[in-house]
């Protein structure tokens, strides 16, 4: 049955989920297939986290972090994430930066400072946005909301492979522990906790290939009467 959700002139597909659930890869491929813009909201938080490390701002100092985020010069060009004009695409994928990003994301003031930046990505012909609160907070009027899940073991294996391919050292047991801690922190924080939107479609990717996951999202989009 087709959705009766009213269409915004610029449609948004949100793909939320926990760390290493595959949402970033799926979102990028869906966006490429549809010719839509892409928002990797996690990259914004990682850029803020990297800046906090560089400028020695403590992760529990919410006011200082919000002030830092307000003044950051962040750009995305040709798939590269730039901080103050320097490409830091690889640097922000380090585990230490990811852990710091999860730690600073608990602060409502930090999340508020990044809301406008995220919503500004909504441009014609459309947007695919991935993150943790895209469907619940940033784009509640999205035409399609997907919540990706996967077992923590599958996610740790994926994360280990990603890190090794990028030249980072990684221990699978440490990754399992980090993921469990991040899941607890993300799900229990007061500001925009990680949870599926009430109208989100759940997609467990534990036993799915990337291609199968992408095709399922596109199939749901086609069910809305949209060309995909």
Curated annotation (Swiss-Prot):
It catalyses: CMP + ATP = CDP + ADP; dCMP + ATP = dCDP + ADP. Its EC number is 2.7.4.25. GO terms for biological process: nucleobase-containing small molecule interconversion; pyrimidine nucleotide metabolic process. ATP binds at residues 17-25. It holds the Pfam family Cytidylate_kin. CDD domains: CMPK (cd02020). Keywords: ATP-binding, Cytoplasm, Kinase, Nucleotide-binding, Transferase. GO terms for cellular component: cytosol. This is Cytidylate kinase. The gene is cmk.
